[in-house]
Amino acid sequence: MMTIMDRSVLYQINSLEKPQKISGFLKEKGYSRQNLVDLRKNEQAICLNGTYVHMNHMLAEGDVLTVWIRETDNSGQIRPVKLPFVIVYEDEDLLVINKPAGMPVHPSRGNPENSLGNALAWYFKEQGVPFVFRCINRLDRDTTGALILAKNPLSAAILSVQMKKRQILRTYLALVDGLLPDSGTINAPIARMEGSVITR
């Protein structure tokens, strides 16, 4: 079990190819535009060699840069409900869980208390940590599998870009009916079942 409210990231500046501001350095590290906007709002978010500085400060070789990622959001509208789920992996930045089949990811008007969001709200409430629901990937209600959640704004930005660039690989297992050859490739879209917007 691991929790995190504010995340600090330390960078040792060993070498620089060219003179660079802190803002440019962080952008190269995967910080989103919104991440940088949030950092600029906090005068104690950027610490360089033990001194708080602004984002336009120039870096030099040998600098030690510490960035404080503050949690400002909250998914307090999601009702905490004690529901079972399995944690596959957890660290300061992300949580990977095995979503049970039959459980939707998000609560809805017709199902406000039996979703993964409710279960995670309970999980974080029990640890006294603000809950922000940041799903990186999606799974249908009846699909079980690994779901990635970002635990802070920086990891959300980095993981979202990786997902868009298809750098996060996903493998699906499916049940099929009938006799199939030992190997082969099906190169065709998976169509929806007639009369359904979910079943394929």
Where are these regions (language model features)?
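RNA pseudouridine synthases
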Residues: 2-200
